[in-house]
Amino acid sequence: MINLKIEENVKESQNVNTLYFNWDQDIRPGQFAMIWIPGYGEIPMSFSGLGRRKSITVKAYGSASRKLTELKAGDDLFLRGPYGNGFDVREGRKLLVGGGSGIVSLYPIADQETDALISAKTRDELIFKDRFPESRRFIATDDGSDGFHGFAHELLQRINIDSYEAIYVCGPEQMMYKVLQVLKGRKVFVQFSLERTMKCGIGICDSCSLGGKQVCKEGPVFNIEELIGNPEFGVYRTTYSGRRIRLNVK
């Protein structure tokens, strides 16, 4: 377990905060760490910023993540990792497709040749929108409060997909499943970063299993070819207790 110090806590939206800290560790875009919150347990978090000054961006959706968002400069941050394979970052034009907080793990890929499709339920839940110039971003909201009125996969169909060398996707699994349907069969290189229930992060507990693949060890990044035909992707998710729940994907 590594003990670091929080340098800064920046509020991104009503329930999302970015925590900055110094850590001299090489990390690939798309890798993650297991963050330990004393008294609350561990949760997996992707890195939203690399370099010597690193960051994680946290959405408060449960007691552990909510406690993380409350950390202040000087507070302890406990983690282990980094884990996972990370993205295969290609040269040339790239498109990031982030749903909800999914743009967080994609952001370290961004360079001067990168566009971003960012989607959320409503304007107030958009994250990192202002980190991309208007000419390089596509915005979609479910309620139409900002940008395109609709879902990420619907807006993606209006974009010239073939103009990109690579497309990287992260978000809720239902959203990614629909994006996969739009992208399969295209010649562009595509990778998805999956978000699944994780307890150990090192391939022991098997709670993150996806059709025989361990997301924490073999992922969390998968090429589109690995997900096409996977019997669980977009079909089931597993709760922390191990219960399988069918996803509502139409």
Curated annotation (Swiss-Prot):
PROSITE patterns: FAD_FR (PS51384)
Family according to the record: Belongs to the PyrK family.
Free-text comment on the cofactor: Binds 1 [2Fe-2S] cluster per subunit. Binds 1 FAD per subunit.
Binding positions ([2Fe-2S] cluster): C200, C205, C208, C216
Complexes and interactors: Heterotetramer of 2 PyrK and 2 PyrD type B subunits.
Name the UniProt record assigns to this protein: Probable dihydroorotate dehydrogenase B (NAD(+)), electron transfer subunit
Keyword vocabulary terms for this entry: 2Fe-2S, Electron transport, FAD, Flavoprotein, Iron, Iron-sulfur, Metal-binding, Pyrimidine biosynthesis, Transport
Pathway: Pyrimidine metabolism; UMP biosynthesis via de novo pathway; orotate from (S)-dihydroorotate (NAD(+) route): step 1/1
Keyword Flavoprotein assigned: yes
Domain FAD-binding FR-type per the UniProt entry, residue ranges: 1-89
GO-annotated molecular function: 2 iron, 2 sulfur cluster binding; electron transfer activity; flavin adenine dinucleotide binding; metal ion binding; oxidoreductase activity
InterPro entries xref list: Cyt_c3_hydrogenase_gsu (IPR012165), Dihydroorotate_DH_ele_sf (IPR037117), Dihydroorotate_DH_Fe-S-bd (IPR019480), Dihydroorotate_DHASE_ETsu (IPR023455), FAD-bd_FR_type (IPR017927), FNR_nucleotide-bd (IPR039261), PyrK_electron_transfer (IPR050353), Riboflavin_synthase-like_b-brl (IPR017938)
Pfam families in the record: DHODB_Fe-S_bind
Role according to the record: Responsible for channeling the electrons from the oxidation of dihydroorotate from the FMN redox center in the PyrD type B subunit to the ultimate electron acceptor NAD(+).
NCBIfam families, A to Z: PRK00054.1-1 (NF000796)
Organism: Thermoplasma volcanium (strain ATCC 51530 / DSM 4299 / JCM 9571 / NBRC 15438 / GSS1)
Regions annotated as coiled coil: none
GO process annotations (BP): 'de novo' UMP biosynthetic process
Cofactor(s) demanded: [2Fe-2S] cluster; FAD
Domain of life from the UniProt record: Archaea
